[in-house]
Amino acid sequence: SPFALSKQVAGDFGGTRNGTVIHWPKRIQTGGGVRTQFSHVNDVAPTILEAANLPMPTMINGIPQIPMQGTSLLYTFDNPGAKERHNTQYFEIIGNRGIYHNGWMARTTVMYPWMAPKRMNTVAADDGWQLYDTTVDFSLSNDLAAQYPERLEAMKAKFMEEAIENQVL
């Protein structure tokens, strides 16, 4: 793969950037097309609901539902070059964290899956972070953290904002 790491390393596309095939001949007229907009597994349900013209559920069996995360991908079906709509996505697995925001990816890896668990779900101020511009660096190979320290700090703050809002930490 063009990616260095694996699924349990949140923020590495080796575990989070996977191909998807959607077949819907009555709607998608351009067979074999490729879409490059950022998407996440949490976009699947909103896409299916929009395609079926169904509302997001607010109550199921008398239980109020937490609003769904994700963005319908239907907009890409008719326009492969459409402007990206899923602009922010956080990642966290066993203390490894990442944040995608407007084409940039920041991540910190505190433990690799093949190591014995030393730190589970911890956040430390000294965790080293990397920064990547995914619009020109598909495989996350050119760390720009030293070149753009202000952007990295903003990305780290964005991760914390998303993590708190979504009860990750």
Q: Which role does the model predict for each range below?
A:
Residues 137:
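Intrinsically disordered, low-complexity polar regions and short flexible loop motifs
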Residues 22-25:
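Conserved nucleotide-sugar donor-binding
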Residues 1-13, 27-37, 41-130, 134, ...:
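C-terminal cap/loop subdomain of S1 sulfatases and analogous C-terminal strand-loop tails that border
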Residues 142-150:
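Active-site-proximal N-terminal segment of extracellular/periplasmic enzymes that hydrolyze or transfer
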Residues 17-20, 41:
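Active-site neighborhoods of enzymes that stabilize oxyanions during catalysis
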Residues 161-163:
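Type III/flagellar export substrates
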Residues 153:
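Substrate-binding clefts and catalytic carboxylate motifs of secreted carbohydrate-active enzymes
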